[in-house]
Every structure is written in structure tokens, then in C-alpha cells.
Amino acid sequence: MALKSYNPTSPARRGLVLVDKSALWKGKPVKALTEGKRKTGGRNNKGHVTSRGIAGGHKQKYRYVDFKRRKWDMPATVERLEYDPNRTAFIALVKYEDGELAYILAPQRLGVGDQVIAGEKTDVKPGNAMLLSQMPVGTIIHNVEMKPGKGGQIARSAGTYVQLVGRDRGMVIVRLNSGEQRYLRGDCMGTVGAVSNPDNGNQNLAKAGRNRWLGKRPLTRGVAKNPVDHPHGGGEGRTSGGRHPVTPWGKPTKGARTRHNKATDKMIIRSRHAKKKR
């Protein structure tokens, strides 16, 4: 999908650049594959704000997307490509030979009428899913499992992908978008291709209201607040905060490392932070 630029017929149209969705399905989703979705407004079950900057937004239905791809050796035909408000990628409605319908993440270069299949070993073509151990080295993949049977967790966002760069003792080595290289079990599943909608990050929404439609509220900078409200607040005139960036509760942010899962540290060959200055 290409980007679509709009003429400045009004202030809200000036600079507006959106992804062209003219090739997507214009009707409603399959009702059996959707469910209602209640908005939280960033509040927990006690009504306390636990995630700031979230409120409102257009009403959405949740689409059940098959991240597991465990219906093996059953060809499926792509019926249509659809917009999904719950994610940045597009989704594809596929119909299996036995008549079952399912939504899958749409990879780039997947079109209506194409056939996809999942299995232990399949052809290397966009939309086909197979075990990582059966893929050729160098394959571009997405929707990659970290635990066999759990469903894809890596590379599900618009335009993302993982590259399989090697094999080692029943494990495979993959390179992630962040630059991290890590081991994954060979019996995990992955889908061939990169995720659709790579231009998602190049959009210019052009007005605050469009972000509100997406359910995003404005976030006030800490340096614009008073000392009572934020560690960066206060000062005479405009200041830079005077310390390393922290959250309103004084925890380091913007680059501070938060990973504490020592059990899987041995699976990471090269950290995504390896390029940073010591």
C-alpha cells in the first residue's frame, strides 16, 4: 500500500499523509471471528489511572487473529485483506479447504486469491508457516514463536520482520529488527515474509483530533510542570530538567534498561545494546 498525500483544502488537511487503504475490504469483519471490546481509559479495576495518555477513541471490535497456525497441511485461499483497528498491520481472511474461516497477519506481497499453507515444512513463500528448523538460512520471517505452541510473539507489528541467520544444535539463530541476535528452539513456528503496511510509520496525522480517534491523549512534558507534580518541574524560566530523564515517580526512563529475565539471558547471543557506547 502506498502513501496518500492530501491537498491543503483546510488546516486539518495541510500536511496530511495517510496510508492508501483503497485495496482493503470495505465491509464489516466476519462476525464469528470478532468480539466486543470495552475501553478502559487507562484505568485498572479500582478506577485508578495505571497507563496515562489513554482515553476515548473510536469504538472497536476485536478480531480473533490466528497467531499459532497449527492447522497443518490444509491449503487456504486468501479471500480478502482487511483493516484491523487493534494493530498496525493489515489482516487477511483465509478460507481453508474444509470451509473454515480464519484471520491471519497479512505479510507483504500477499494478495487476494493467493494460497497459503502451514505445516512442518512448506514452500518458502509469503504467508506460509512452518517450523524454524526447516527454513533455509537467510529467510525473512514474521509472527515468530518463542515457545512451541504458544503462538507468534516476535515481529507482529507493521513492516517488521526477523531474519534467520544460522542453526546450532537443534536451535536456530535469528536477528531481530532491534539488532539483537538470539537463539530460538527449532520446533517453534514462523511465517515467511515481512508484515504488511511498512509505510505505517511514515504517516502524518496533521491534527490532534486524529490521535484522539486512535485513543491517545496529550502527554504533558515534565519540564512544563511544577516541582510538586514532576521531578523535572519548576525552575525560573525554561529549564532542561537538570538531571537524567525520569518518570513522574523518579524512575529512570529514556534508555534505562528494564530487562530482568536472567533465565533466558543465555539465549541472547548479541544484545541490542551492543552498539551503544560503554
Curated annotation (Swiss-Prot):
Keywords of this entry: Ribonucleoprotein, Ribosomal protein, RNA-binding, rRNA-binding
Residue ranges with Basic residues bias: 269-278
Protein family membership: Belongs to the universal ribosomal protein uL2 family.
Protein name: Large ribosomal subunit protein uL2
GO biological process: cytoplasmic translation
Subunit structure: Part of the 50S ribosomal subunit. Forms a bridge to the 30S subunit in the 70S ribosome.
Gene Ontology MF term list: rRNA binding; structural constituent of ribosome; transferase activity
Pfam families xref list: Ribosomal_L2, Ribosomal_L2_C
Gene label: rplB
Protein role: One of the primary rRNA binding proteins. Required for association of the 30S and 50S subunits to form the 70S ribosome, for tRNA binding and peptide bond formation. It has been suggested to have peptidyltransferase activity; this is somewhat controversial. Makes several contacts with the 16S rRNA in the 70S ribosome.
Gene Ontology cellular-component terms listed: large ribosomal subunit
Keyword match Nuclease: no
Taxonomic lineage of the native organism: Bacteria, Pseudomonadati, Pseudomonadota, Alphaproteobacteria, Sphingomonadales
Keyword Ribonucleoprotein in annotation: yes
Disordered as annotated region, ranges: 33-53, 221-278
